[in-house]
């Protein structure tokens, strides 16, 4: 619910015909002579666009949202009329709050305070309820101690569902009812365990109110028997490290290990009656529940998306709430690859006398929008073609329109469209005849939207009415200051193109050339892939002026960078994605090597200084690319890599590689190690010399390497590495004074073989 604190000032700009100046369909190159510096680019870009994010309020008046004034008060504003009303005075706002959520009728606010991070999305907090009319602040639980995991308002009444100690509670008008009694270290009610949070939901909750607020669907996870993994924290955020590191034990299922089991439950809010719904779509040990959605405007029907363990078979199961009867209303075999969990089911209601819900599927080979009957039956395709729907932005059941983003122009672009599920007519809301990257945020009733142009030029945001997508009502964010600032700089020259593989597929490439590029000079090159399944790095979104832009701009470095999206990456169709199924690390490095050979056809490319650097999956890809020993790459930097997918978590790995039993040949037989420390030891024991291997540990950092000053140190080290590599001369490799070859040169001694 966090919203912009400066939006109300921006709205004073008034009516705008169109963004000025108009954006060219290409990245900016600047207009001056200044070059980007290290401090401007790392550890994060300081020269960057601003954007506004709104949490729209569903009220009688469309276009309303909550903003915060300079003194901290919460203001109800209308983005169209600029009218505003103070809902919560500044002196009623809890100090140091982390987040807040308004009750649907705007009569109360739920505050989260005393935030303590848990995993990527989850956290612990205290929660308080502010009655706006009375001004009273009441704790959600009288004895709370910063230990509540999640809380959510009912959509219709005065109830709050919350989770504490992995048990589910319902609060209503000051009275609390404990729903479950079995929550504990291994049993989770209404919140996901670590692997479901990280790999399935991408969120911290596993409970869903019915639209009328009368029922609650929730999942229960049981981690009993799931192997544990211990994470040591050596400094543990202390100035002086403790004598013994703090050890965090989490249940971390690896490939072919036991997974958490999951159950589906329904709760009648009024009676507190809980019902366990048997899940028979797949056996308990072969079951993943990926999504839950209510398929009614009240509480008649709810559905869940069930996958088998390796996520290449899918069943949508509908549950009739009154009878508790379950029925498979849709199923799919995706054993040619995997089935992505897109979390895109949404009930739309009656269409020509039959109830439907909308969903995205790539069963045709391309991700498209379909209408599916609530009770099962033949689907209706709303979009088709050799392009993909990326996301559904809004379903407007009054106008019978679905708003979405797609790659219709090109896989690297995003344009906003609507499609009528009555007439199937598809309409662009933007100019879809040129390369651009858009998204949109729609008001609660769908009457207005903020259109966000995100690249390739300087981003901006405008407000539109859905009745007229040609003329903006207002400019929300112009980024005029950034436009002016960039005129002082000479920026890297960014371009996009495709290269064609011998097998016929094309790979998207993003190239950065130094600002003072001279085609008659030789330049070192750094490849910067991610390359993971379904991911995308090469897009027309704003080119962040980050570390990659710095090493391209610094006169002492002047690296050309190439980012190549290999086979397996996203938005180019199912066949392109699924090519890597059961063999991660096989095709991806081949594609990077092929791209490097294509690069070397340019006379300016220095064949003696071609590097590759990747993070996470990109770190894995870096190592696998060097492992090919192609003779093309001369150095690699692998950051936070997965090194052996048998040792990564089960729900990610098995989606793409299956289990060891199903894919014995798919395991990496070349390097066996638990983590990067073991890899380092393996390489040293394998005879790799000190001048060819450098390692650095960031012991207390998470995957993003953000603890304390770790990020600052990391980028200084990266800058030194690429500088040292540029200075390296293949005819005279650097040698330490103790090298036998140096001694031989100095004293005429014969160096030992």
UniProtKB/Swiss-Prot annotation:
Glycosylated positions are 84, 114, 222
Q: Where is the signal peptide?
A: 1-18
What are the EC numbers?
A: 3.4.14.5
The cysteines covalently paired via disulfide bonds are none
UniProt-annotated catalytic positions: 616 (charge relay system), 668 (charge relay system), 703 (charge relay system)
Q: Name one GO molecular function term.
A: serine-type endopeptidase activity
Q: Where in the cell is it found?
A: Secreted
According to its UniProt entry, the protein's GO biological process terms are: proteolysis
Record has Ribonucleoprotein as a keyword:
no
UniProt keyword terms in alphabetical order: Aminopeptidase, Glycoprotein, Hydrolase, Protease, Secreted, Serine protease, Signal, Virulence
What reaction is this protein's catalytic activity? Release of an N-terminal dipeptide, Xaa-Yaa-|-Zaa-, from a polypeptide, preferentially when Yaa is Pro, provided Zaa is neither Pro nor hydroxyproline
Indicate yes or no for the key word Hydrolase: yes
- State the family named in the UniProt similarity comment for this chain: Belongs to the peptidase S9B family.
What's this protein's function?
Extracellular dipeptidyl-peptidase which removes N-terminal dipeptides sequentially from polypeptides having unsubstituted N-termini provided that the penultimate residue is proline. Contributes to pathogenicity.
Question: Protein name, please?
Answer: Probable dipeptidyl peptidase 4
Which organism is the protein's source? Answer: Trichophyton verrucosum (strain HKI 0517)
């Amino acid at each position: 619910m966090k919203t912009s604190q400066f939006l109300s000032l921006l709205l004073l700009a008034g009516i705008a015909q169109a963004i000025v100046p108009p954006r060219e369909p290409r990245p900016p190159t600047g207009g001056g002579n200044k070059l980007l510096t290290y401090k401007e680019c790392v550890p994060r870009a300081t020269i960057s666009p601003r954007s506004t994010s709104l949490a729209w309020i569903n009220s009688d008046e469309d276009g309303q949202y909550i903003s915060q004034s300079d003194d901290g008060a919460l203001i109800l504003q209308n983005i169209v009329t600029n009218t505003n009303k103070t809902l919560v005075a500044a002196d009623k706002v809890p100090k140091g709050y982390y987040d807040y959520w308004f009750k649907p009728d705007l009569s109360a606010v739920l505050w989260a305070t005393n935030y303590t991070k848990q995993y990527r999305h989850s956290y612990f907090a205290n929660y308080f309820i502010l009655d706006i009319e009375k001004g009273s602040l009441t704790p959600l639980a009288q004895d709370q101690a910063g230990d509540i995991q999640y809380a959510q308002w009912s959509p219709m009444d005065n109830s709050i569902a919350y989770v504490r100690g992995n048990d589910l509670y319902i609060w209503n008008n000051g009275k609390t009812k404990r729903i479950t009694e079995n929550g504990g270290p291994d049993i989770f009610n209404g919140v996901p365990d670590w692997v479901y949070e990280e790999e399935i939901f991408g969120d911290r909750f596993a409970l869903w109110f019915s639209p009328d607020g009368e029922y609650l669907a929730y999942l229960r996870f049981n981690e009993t028997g799931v192997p544990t993994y211990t994470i040591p924290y050596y400094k543990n955020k202390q100035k002086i490290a403790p004598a013994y590191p703090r050890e965090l034990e989490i249940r971390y299922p690896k490939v072919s290990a036991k997974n958490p089991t999951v159950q589906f439950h329904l709760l009648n809010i009024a009676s507190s009656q809980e019902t366990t719904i048997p899940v028979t779509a797949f056996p308990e040990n072969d079951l993943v529940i990926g999504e839950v959605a209510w398929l009614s405007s009240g509480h008649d029907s709810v559905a869940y998306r069930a996958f088998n363990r390796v996520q290449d078979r899918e069943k949508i199961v509908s549950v009739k709430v009154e009878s508790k009867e379950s029925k498979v209303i849709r199923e799919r075999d995706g054993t040619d690859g995997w089935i992505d969990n897109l979390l895109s089911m949404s009930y739309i209601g009656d269409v020509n006398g039959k109830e439907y819900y909308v969903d995205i599927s790539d069963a045709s080979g391309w991700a498209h929008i379909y209408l599916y009957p609530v009770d099962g039956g033949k689907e209706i395709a709303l979009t088709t073609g050799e392009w993909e729907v990326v996301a559904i932005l809004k379903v407007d059941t009054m106008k019978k329109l679905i708003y979405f983003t797609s790659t219709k122009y090109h896989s690297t672009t995003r344009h906003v469209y609507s499609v009528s599920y009555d007439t199937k007519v598809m309409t662009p809301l933007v100019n879809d005849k040129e390369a651009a990257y858009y998204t949109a945020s729609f008001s609660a009733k769908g009457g207005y939207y903020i259109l966000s142009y995100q690249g390739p030029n300087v981003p901006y945001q405008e407000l539109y009415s859905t009745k007229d997508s040609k003329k903006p009502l207002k400019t929300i964010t112009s980024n005029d200051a950034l436009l002016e600032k960039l005129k002082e700089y000479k920026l890297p020259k960014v371009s996009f193109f495709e290269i064609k593989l011998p097998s016929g597929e094309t790979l998207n490439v993003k190239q950065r050339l130094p600002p003072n590029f001279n085609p008659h000079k030789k330049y070192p090159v750094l490849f910067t892939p991610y390359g993971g399944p379904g991911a995308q790095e090469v897009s027309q979104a704003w080119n962040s002026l980050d570390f990659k832009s710095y090493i391209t701009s610094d006169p002492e470095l002047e690296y050309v960078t190439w980012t190549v999206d290999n086979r397996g990456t996203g938005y180019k169709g199912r066949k392109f994605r699924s090519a890597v199924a059961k063999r991660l690390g096989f095709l991806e490095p081949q594609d990077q090597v092929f791209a490097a050979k294509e690069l070397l056809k340019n006379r300016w490319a220095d064949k003696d200084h071609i590097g590759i650097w990747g993070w996470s999956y990109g770190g894995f890809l870096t190592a696998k690319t060097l492992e090919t020993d192609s003779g093309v790459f001369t150095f690699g930097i692998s950051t936070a890599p997965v090194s052996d997918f048998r040792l990564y978590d089960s729900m990610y790995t098995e989606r793409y590689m299956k289990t060891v039993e199903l894919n014995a040949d798919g395991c990496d037989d070349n390097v066996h190690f638990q983590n990067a420390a073991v890899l380092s030891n393996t390489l040293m024991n394998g005879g790799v010399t000190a001048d060819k291997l450098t390692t650095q540990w960031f012991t207390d950092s998470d995957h993003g390497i953000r603890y304390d000053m770790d990020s600052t140190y990391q980028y200084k080290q990266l800058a030194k590495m690429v500088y040292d590599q540029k200075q390296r001369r293949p005819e005279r490799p650097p040698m330490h004074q103790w090298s036998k070859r140096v001694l031989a040169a100095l004293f005429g001694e014969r160096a030992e073989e």
